[in-house]
Amino acid sequence: MTKQVGKKFAWVIKNFSSLQCKKFYSVPFQIGDCKWRLSIYPKGNNCDYLSLFLEVADFKSLPSGWRRYVKLRLYIVKQLSTLIRKTHRWFDQEMWGWGFLYMLPLTKLHDEKEGFLVNGELMIVAEVDALGFIDPLNESEESEDPTQPLKKIKLNDDGAVSSDLLEEASPRKESMEVNGFQVLPSQVESVRLIFERHPDIASEFRAKNQYLRKACMDFLLSLVETLCQSLQEFSNEDLVEADIALTYLKDAGFKVDWLEKKLDQVRDKKEKERSCLAKLQETEETLLKLKQKCTELDALMDTEKAELSAIRTPLSFEDVV
């Protein structure tokens, strides 16, 4: 069962635990000028994790040299909360599918206490924001697909799906050059700030091809944006992907020692967060035990007060004679 509302696509897989196939596909759905589909490995893709990917369903029919830059959010909805994974990727004729190999441990997925499977059903929501594409006939332009009035799905605390009307339109945008890199107008200030603070960042970057130069700059901006996430949103997978992105940028010739230090700081803060969460959980458990003990002591005091009151009751005349 599927439902699409604007940029979000909801996919409910019934009898999920009964699936025997290695790979399972959703029906195609249209966002922008591409048809997309989700693919899932119910038993993991050679790992003990649920694997989930977004693919361009009609990539064979697209013109040679096509590219799409996509902001992707994948949600696995559970009863009380939602698992979210986010990434930013270029989709092209060589790499027309991206996703998460380690989306969710299978043991956690099938644990009834976790609440991912409800009556045997698994609900997945994909938010696909196709930001733009590079026209192979005109590399100086960067355009974005116009969006029509749409409804945006919101996930409630109980995992239900509701719809709010949201109208927005994105006009066609020209790319702009900043320090030799073609960027979108929305990226200009960020790129300028990077070069102001780190003027030699691209001094050893030798690529001349504008596609490659833009892809690398998008990679850099995505990495910075990733590091700006709150620690609560920052997952172990984000750390791994950030390391990969940093290595890619260094290999390409970018001087990103400053960014590596920031990543180390985030990694340290994430470790401290885990430690604090563990201590907090331990304190909460201790407090719960103390509260339980207080409740038991209150009940004991009430019993002893009643007993004392009974003992103090004076004898009546009839009791005495």
Curated annotation (Swiss-Prot):
Domain MATH: 6-128
Keyword Nucleotidyltransferase: no
SMART domains according to UniProt: MATH
Keywords attached to this entry: Coiled coil
Alphabetical list of Pfam families matching this protein: MATH_2
Record SUPFAM superfamilies: TRAF domain-like (SSF49599)
Keyword Secreted: no
Coiled coil: 255-310
PROSITE patterns: MATH
Official protein name in the record: MATH domain and coiled-coil domain-containing protein At3g58410
Organism (species): Arabidopsis thaliana (Mouse-ear cress)
